[in-house]
Amino acid sequence: MIEIIQEYWKSLLWTDGYRFTGVAITLWLLISSVVMGGLLAVILAVGRVSSNKFIRFPIWLFTYIFRGTPLYVQLLVFYSGMYTLEIVKGTDLLNAFFRSGLNCTVLALTLNTCAYTTEIFAGAIRSVPHGEIEAARAYGFSSFKMYRCIILPSALRIALPAYSNEVILMLHSTALAFTATVPDLLKIARDINSATYQPFTAFGIAAVLYLLISYVLISLFRRAERRWLQHVSSK
């Protein structure tokens, strides 16, 4: 084990000398997909609870598709399937985008977490106390101001425990990136196993690194919950 760590620690953590690899790529996949998916989910969640069915139905359909199909299949569709379409081949921008395994992986992860996060946020919006909404209306708040100042801040706090679980699940989901030849942590562990024929050591090291990242994320979310949900836990 010591020999493997000494030889491959840079590849496992951040680079193989030619490109970013290992933990660095895993964190990039996680952060980029969670940030983009989360921002998009806030907008979609507002539409998800809309009384207008022409707004609500397309968003429901989007979340149904991406929550109802395996992420692995979604990644294969983007990485292996999209590039076979004539419209993609004939468009320089799309052609360049879908030829990149990293781009396809980020896209699949972003849309997948967006679908789950949309439902989490929509449920939290429905859970905002009705009294807060009535008070905002009594003060003459517009719908936009009411969402910005009252509903969304309360909903995001309510959603925090469920959202923390989604982020941890997304960390685990980044392990599928090797399918698109992205040199994430699991891909480097597989390469180490191929070079050394020591699967227990190679994948064991990867498991420890995933556990460490999970521990840091859980600690950060627990601290956030203690800060922003203190009024809930004290009741």
From Swiss-Prot:
CDD domains, alphabetized: TM_PBP2 (cd06261)
Periplasmic compartment segments: 1-26, 80-104, 179-199
Transmembrane annotation, as ranges: 27-47, 59-79, 105-125, 158-178, 200-220
Stored PROSITE patterns: ABC_TM1
GO biological process, one term: amino acid transport
Membrane topology: Multi-pass membrane protein
CC terms in the record's Gene Ontology section: ATP-binding cassette (ABC) transporter complex; plasma membrane
GO molecular function: transmembrane transporter activity
KW Cell membrane (keyword) present: yes
UniProt xrefs under Pfam families: BPD_transp_1 (PF00528)
Keywords tagged on the record: Amino-acid transport, Cell inner membrane, Cell membrane, Membrane, Transmembrane, Transmembrane helix, Transport
Cytoplasmic-side positions: 48-58, 126-157, 221-235
Limits of the ABC transmembrane type-1 domain: 23-221
Annotated compartments: Cell inner membrane
Subunit structure, as described in the record: The HisPMQJ complex is composed of two ATP-binding proteins (HisP), two transmembrane proteins (HisM and HisQ) and a solute-binding protein (HisJ). The HisPMQ-ArgT complex is composed of two ATP-binding proteins (HisP), two transmembrane proteins (HisM and HisQ) and a solute-binding protein (ArgT).
Family recorded in the similarity comment: Belongs to the binding-protein-dependent transport system permease family. HisMQ subfamily.
Function noted in UniProt: Part of the ABC transporter complex HisPMQJ involved in histidine transport. Is also part of the ABC transporter complex HisPMQ-ArgT involved in lysine/arginine/ornithine transport. Probably responsible for the translocation of the substrate across the membrane. Required to relay the ATPase-inducing signal from the solute-binding protein to HisP.
Name of the protein: Histidine/lysine/arginine/ornithine transport system permease protein HisM
Organism: Salmonella typhimurium (strain LT2 / SGSC1412 / ATCC 700720)
Gene name in the database record: hisM
